[in-house]
């Protein structure tokens, strides 16, 4: 099974896929220099391929590449996982905490 995390590098694409999208969406807001981001990235990748979460869309943004998007979302620490439902932000998990991330995804796609 392939990884289902798509990297978004353009603010317009972010708006189209996340803010104007439908269904459950999870966005990993991270940075290349962030150690905890690198540590939890394989967990996020694994969760994105889970049959249990097949109806959710998984995206990643680099807060340095998309600083205007990160500012608009209010990202203050990395990693921050943002949860959207039909374009509306409904939850977030801050920090590299695999159990909290998995629990939040389960609640989000239920």
UniProtKB/Swiss-Prot annotation:
InterPro entries, per the entry: Thioredoxin, Thioredoxin-like_sf, Thioredoxin_CS, Thioredoxin_domain
Site features described as Deprotonates C-terminal active site Cys, chain residue numbers: 28
Gene3D superfamilies xrefs: Glutaredoxin
UniProt keywords, alphabetically: Allergen, Disulfide bond, Redox-active center
Catalytic site positions: 34, 37
Disulfide topology: 34-37
Keyword Disulfide bond recorded: yes
Annotated Thioredoxin domain residues: 1-110
PROSITE patterns according to UniProt: THIOREDOXIN_1, THIOREDOXIN_2
Protein's UniProt keywords contain Disulfide bond: yes
Site (Contributes to redox potential value): 35-36
Pfam families, alphabetized: Thioredoxin (PF00085)
MF GO annotations: protein-disulfide reductase activity
Role description: Participates in various redox reactions through the reversible oxidation of its active center dithiol to a disulfide and catalyzes dithiol-disulfide exchange reactions.
Family: Belongs to the thioredoxin family.
NCBIfam families registered for this protein in UniProt: thioredoxin (TIGR01068)
Protein name: Thioredoxin Asp f 29
Organism of provenance: Aspergillus fumigatus (Neosartorya fumigata)
């Amino acid at each position: 099974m392939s990884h289902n995390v798509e990297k978004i590098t353009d603010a317009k694409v972010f708006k189209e896929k996340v803010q104007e999208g439908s269904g459950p969406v999870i966005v990993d807001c991270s940075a290349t220099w962030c150690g905890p981001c690198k540590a939890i990235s394989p967990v996020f990748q694994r969760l994105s391929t889970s049959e249990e979460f097949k109806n959710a869309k998984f995206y990643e943004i680099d807060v340095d590449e998309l600083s205007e998007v990160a500012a608009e979302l209010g990202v203050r620490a990395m990693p921050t996982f943002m949860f959207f439902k039909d374009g509306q932000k409904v939850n977030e998990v801050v920090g590299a905490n695999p159990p909290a991330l998995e629990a939040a995804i389960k609640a989000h796609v239920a």
